[in-house]
Amino acid sequence: MSGLTVVFAGTPEFGLSCLDALIQSRHHLKAVYTQPDRPAGRGRKLQESPVKEWAINNQVPVYQPLNFKNQEAIDELSALKPDVMVVIAYGLILPKAVLEIPRLGCINVHASLLPRWRGASPIQHAILHGDAESGVTIMQMDVGLDTGPMLCKATCPVTSSDTAGSLHDKLAKMSVKPLLDVLEALASNSAQFELQNNELATYAGKINKEEARINWHQSAVEIDRKIRAFNPWPVAYTLAEELMLRIHQAKATDIMSTEMPGMVLNIDKNGMLVATNDNALLVEKIQFPGAKVISVRDWLNSGKTQLHTGLMLQ
């Protein structure tokens, strides 16, 4: 049984573990599709995606169409004659004409246990909502948003210390085996499909920076989840006398408080204790504008005074 001719479509780091596995497998990675280079950083220089960098380093042809709305881009993909297209966080909607090009269709590696958290930010939403477990789903793509039939699932626990960054890395690594298993099943014509139950579907919309501001009238647990869900991006923040204070690490405590939500109750080497709608939140790592991420302990040792007991964070 010969290997499959695979075209990969993806943009961020999440797909790199699978690319490493694909190029070492018996399948033939014919080409990589990724989004066009984008201006980034203070200099606004064009920046290649992590997937493009990987492809160049591994001498795999790269294609970067703006979209698939023109026939030229569709013909270009069709000429590659892929058996299957593997899509991981590509960031472009694939029209029906593209989905029908590969002989065995397009399969997607999605970072949730579908049908829960269809959409752009499943990892963040799993943490925001306190899910006990997450995972990856390999599905056959159709024209809907993460609605296609499922081929394989793999689960992992979400711990109370997981951030979006740590959960991202766990899911990226654990997606390799399910993907290779599905490719083998497709190659041997033994793949089994399970339809999604649309009644159980939830949606994870795109995260934006405006959502990152902390509402101290929420519970300590909800704020803790938000801080972890928005780390490493966009990073949860509050205002300390008009200064933006980013909070990189905190944890809910069982210390009850009757003070106004947002009031700094205490600062010591363990952290900064802040009142919420119920129990206090212990803030452990912070960042002021233009400064590095620092522990509250190290900030105290620096002798600075922007933060103090009685301060109202907003």
Curated annotation (Swiss-Prot):
Which SUPFAM superfamilies does UniProt cross-reference here?
Answer: FMT C-terminal domain-like, Formyltransferase
InterPro entries in the record, alphabetically? Fmt (IPR005794), Formyl_trans_C (IPR005793), Formyl_transf_N (IPR002376), Formyl_transf_N_sf (IPR036477), Formyl_transferase-like_C_sf (IPR011034), GART_AS (IPR001555), Met-tRNA-FMT_C (IPR044135), Met-tRNA-FMT_N (IPR041711)
Q: Which reaction does it catalyse?
A: L-methionyl-tRNA(fMet) + (6R)-10-formyltetrahydrofolate = N-formyl-L-methionyl-tRNA(fMet) + (6S)-5,6,7,8-tetrahydrofolate + H(+)
The UniProt entry, under PROSITE patterns, shows: GART
Q: Where is the signal peptide?
A: none
Top EC group: transferase
Q: Please give the Pfam families that the UniProt record associates with this protein.
A: Formyl_trans_C, Formyl_trans_N
UniProt-annotated binding residues for (6S)-5,6,7,8-tetrahydrofolate: 112-115
EC assignment: 2.1.2.9
Q: Which UniProt keywords are given for this protein, alphabetically ordered?
A: Protein biosynthesis, Transferase
Q: Which GO terms describe its molecular function?
A: methionyl-tRNA formyltransferase activity
Q: Which GO terms describe its cellular component?
A: cytosol
Q: Which family does it belong to?
A: Belongs to the Fmt family.
Cited HAMAP family: Formyl_trans (MF_00182)
Query: What does this protein do, in the record's words?
Result: Attaches a formyl group to the free amino group of methionyl-tRNA(fMet). The formyl group appears to play a dual role in the initiator identity of N-formylmethionyl-tRNA by promoting its recognition by IF2 and preventing the misappropriation of this tRNA by the elongation apparatus.
Q: Which NCBIfam families match?
A: fmt
Q: What is this protein called?
A: Methionyl-tRNA formyltransferase
Species in which this protein is naturally found = Legionella pneumophila (strain Corby)
Its taxonomic placement starts with:
Bacteria, Pseudomonadati, Pseudomonadota, Gammaproteobacteria, Legionellales
Q: Which gene specifies this protein's sequence?
A: fmt
